[in-house]
Swiss-Prot record:
Name of the protein in question: Insulin-like growth factor-binding protein 3
UniProt cross-references to InterPro entries, sorted A to Z: Growth_fac_rcpt_cys_sf (IPR009030), IGFBP-3 (IPR012211), IGFBP-like (IPR000867), IGFBP_1-6_chordata (IPR022321), Insulin_GF-bd_Cys-rich_CS (IPR017891), Thyroglobulin_1 (IPR000716), Thyroglobulin_1_sf (IPR036857)
Listed PROSITE patterns: IGFBP_N_1, IGFBP_N_2, THYROGLOBULIN_1_1, THYROGLOBULIN_1_2
Organism: Sus scrofa
A GO MF label: fibronectin binding
Length: 293
């Protein structure tokens, strides 16, 4: 029996490793940590009996377990080979990493544009997503202006110490008027920048809705939801397989879950199942002739 490509839990584990830090642990591994825990069904004799024979040794240098909660063995990817959420695992001592300098590392892994590289460099993954710390001593313009205003306010009474001096009185009034104009200008600048920022945020949200397809929006909503979970259920989460434009790829899969074998089906670009394909069907489903590029 042909096995279905196990896509779901590889996506969940990689997404959590990137977004939360520590990798997800299997329930029976006994690994301690604060990361989320994935509870997989046991790989007993009944589950292993449903696996196809492992690949022969010459074409397969190393055997590894299926991604996620799968129980069967498959060929491991070698160093330098392309990898991602929907591919097989990298070999021992290797980890799937986004290309160096990739501006969107998580999307690169979802698109299968990662590279199997030495695991000692895997700690760099989080650096792609962590925002740069603010430079020390960087204050806002309004804080600097307030400091200047405070210094000017402290110096202002000195102009009143000269008795019966009309010249100093005129200068004092001029200074007060100038300061008032400066504060009004700063207040207008802050209000204008705030309105401009709100307009840009609204425009970016509108642009996201129009540019990203339904599959991409579902995937991002699911990954955002995973940030707040401390425990994952293999039955409760589905991460779709999206193309580069954010629409659904023709082939969607559910992974193996211990005793329960995975399955695949074909959909259109909006995620609707195509007629003639049984969603619960077993074995491999060939949608490649219709695969969107």
């Amino acid at each position: 029996m042909q096995r279905a490509r196990p896509a779901l839990w590889a996506a969940a584990l990689i997404a959590l490793a990137l977004l939360r830090g520590p990798p997800a642990a299997r329930a029976g591994s006994g690994a301690a940590g604060t990361g989320p825990v994935v509870r997989c069904e046991p790989c007993d004799a009944r589950a292993l009996a449903q696996c196809a024979p492992p690949p022969a040794a010459p074409p397969c240098a190393e055997l590894v377990r299926e991604p996620g909660c799968g129980c069967c063995l498959t060929c491991a990817l070698r160093e330098g080979q392309a990898c991602g959420v929907y591919t097989e695992r990298c070999g021992a001592g290797l980890r799937c990493q986004p290309p160096p300098g990739e501006p969107r590392p998580l999307q690169a892994l979802l698109d299968g544009r990662g590279i199997c590289a030495n695991a000692s460099a895997a700690g760099r993954l989080r650096a792609y997503l962590l925002p740069a710390p603010p430079a020390p001593g960087n204050g806002s313009e309004s804080e600097e202006d307030r400091s200047v205003d405070s210094m000017e306010n402290q110096a202002l009474p000195s102009t009143h110490r000269v008795p019966d001096s009309k010249l100093h009185s005129v200068h004092t009034k001029m200074d007060v008027i100038k300061k008032g104009h400066a504060k009004d200008s700063q207040r207008y600048k802050v209000d204008y920048e705030s309105q401009s920022t709100d307009t840009q945020n609204f425009s970016s949200e509108s642009k996201r809705e129009t540019e990203y397809g339904p599959c991409r929006r579902e995937m991002e909503d699911t990954l955002n939801h995973l940030k707040f979970l401390n425990m994952l259920s293999p039955r409760g989460i589905h991460i779709p397989n999206c193309d580069k434009k954010g629409f659904y790829k023709k082939k969607q899969c559910r992974p193996s879950k211990g005793r329960k074998r995975g399955f695949c089906w074909c959909v259109d670009k909006y995620g609707q199942p195509l007629p003639g394909f049984d969603v619960k069907g077993k074995g491999d489903v060939h949608c490649y002739s219709m695969e969107s590029k």
